[in-house]
């Protein structure tokens, strides 16, 4: 296991440097923050996972919940390293058992995510993980679902925060503490 101190830069700067910006994708005016270069580097992935593990090792968690789809990349690895369970929060229609659903607003329309109704029990301590926080809608929906099941949502966590889009302020305003590794200005 590599320690974050083995990274060539400050761990946060190292992670930030591995995130590619793709202008005008998926539409003009959007600066897409692409985490695939980060994931392709074993060293960068190890540093990233270690940052999350070091943050939550003493948090007495029961689960790490991952948001569909890119939250599924990091969340199970962190859950494994912490020896806790993983809870998927999926786009609607992807879970085979009885579910609870939560819809949230998009720029043009709505989306819905769901969780198995037996994914956790009252009092379970959970951290929600995603790749980035933009408008905050998906993470807020995940928080609402977990709380509906009686879980204690300890924190929301993401690799990237896009604070100019207002999601992190929205989530904090709703009482959800947040941890993000790095942030980028703009859209």
From Swiss-Prot:
Coiled coil: none annotated. One of its GO terms (cellular component) is cytoplasm. SUPFAM superfamilies: PRTase-like. Its EC number is 2.4.2.7. InterPro entries: Ade_phspho_trans, PRibTrfase_dom, PRTase-like, UPRTase/APRTase. Transmembrane segments: none annotated. Catalyzes a salvage reaction resulting in the formation of AMP, that is energically less costly than de novo synthesis. Belongs to the purine/pyrimidine phosphoribosyltransferase family. This is Adenine phosphoribosyltransferase. The lineage of its organism: Bacteria, Pseudomonadati, Pseudomonadota, Betaproteobacteria, Burkholderiales.
